[in-house]
Design a protein with these regions (language model features):
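Electrostatic cytochrome c docking/interface patches
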Residues: 22-40, 150-176
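Ligand-binding pocket scaffold of soluble enzyme catalytic domains
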Residues: 30, 89, 106, 123, ...
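Periplasmic/extracellular electron-transfer cofactor-ligation site
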Residues: 36-70, 98-106, 134-138, 175-207, ...
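Extended, well-folded interaction surfaces typified by the phenylalanyl-tRNA synthetase beta subunit core
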Residues: 139-150
Length: 285
């Protein structure tokens, strides 16, 4: 009887102090490595590392959002004073998936939590483990200056375990960590994506132009083979021989990891998925 009561007490303690979705023990090297892969599938979270900044994930990239205001990417290193070092795993996950800081402040949706909310439980836990493994950097970024309230975005509950292969894997990667639609889907006046033109390209962040990546034969990538799409994702080289530039080049190269580190199987899975989305005639350039 005493043994049974002790087991119940211990189980209760675990449930209270180690809630589901938050690792209870020190992460294994395998978990950290998997987290780095997820980090790379997100383009190395390149917005959080400025070329002349303080270092990996130290933040400080400025986004001038016109009439919305100005925001800066935060320091996401494990520094206790200026980064996320004092945040719990659950708080880090909440910021990634829901765009909410521990103090309740909402992140401006230039942080793609609409898509990051799709990252599976097992992979987001690995991602947090990796974020905690990088060098802590003391770097204070400027405060944001918004002219309007932070727009709300729809959050989709994540799956518990990430799909492992096939089109489902490709859809998961493109619609989650890869957040392809964040740049490749045109925006409405309120900065939300116009999903009637899903992946059809147009003006992107930082005055860039995002390509039409629907399988339209004339204005999209309909004439590209799956192998050519996969090669582009990993190398930045188009079938024409031209290379990616601007933001696309940034996410391919990444930081400590990027699209270049995708496995061939995952790159092909994304390619297969892109071949199945509705083709849209939209000439970007």
């Amino acid at each position: 009887m005493i043994g049974r009561r002790l087991a119940v007490i211990l189980a209760t303690v675990v449930l209270i102090f180690c809630p589901r979705g938050v690792p209870a023990a020190d992460p294994t090297p395998e978990l950290v490595a998997r987290g780095k892969y997820v980090f790379g599938a997100a383009g190395g979270c390149a917005c959080h590392t400025t070329p002349d900044g303080a270092g990996l994930n130290a933040g400080g990239t400025k986004f001038d959002l016109s009439f919305f205001g100005v925001v800066y990417t935060p320091n996401i290193t494990p520094d206790a004073g200026t980064g996320i070092g004092k945040w719990t795993d659950a708080q880090v996950i909440n910021a990634i998936r829901r765009g909410e800081r521990p103090d309740g402040a909402k992140l401006f949706p230039i942080h793609p939590y609409k898509y990051f909310s799709n990252i599976a439980d097992d992979e987001i836990e690995a991602l947090v483990a990796y974020l905690r493994s990088v060098k802590a950097i003391t770097s204070t970024v400027p405060a944001r200056s918004l002219k309007i309230p932070v727009p709300a975005r729809t959050i989709v509950p994540a799956v518990k375990i990430a799909p492992r292969d096939g089109r489902a894997r490709g859809a998961y990667l493109a619609g989650g960590a890869g957040h392809c639609a964040e740049c490749h889907t045109p925006r409405r006046f309120d900065a939300s994506t116009d999903d009637t033109k899903f992946l059809a390209g147009g003006p992107g962040p930082e005055r860039s132009l995002a390509a039409n990546i629907t399988p339209h034969n004339e204005t999209g990538i309909g004439r590209w083979t799956e192998a050519q799409i996969a090669r582009f994702l990993r190398t930045g080289v188009k079938p024409s021989g031209h290379e990616a530039y601007s933001l696309m080049r940034t996410v391919i190269v990444g930081t400590s990891a990027g699209f270049k580190d995708l496995t061939e199987a995952d790159a092909l899975a994304i390619a297969r998925y892109l071949k199945t989305v509705p083709p849209i005639d939209n000439k970007v350039r």
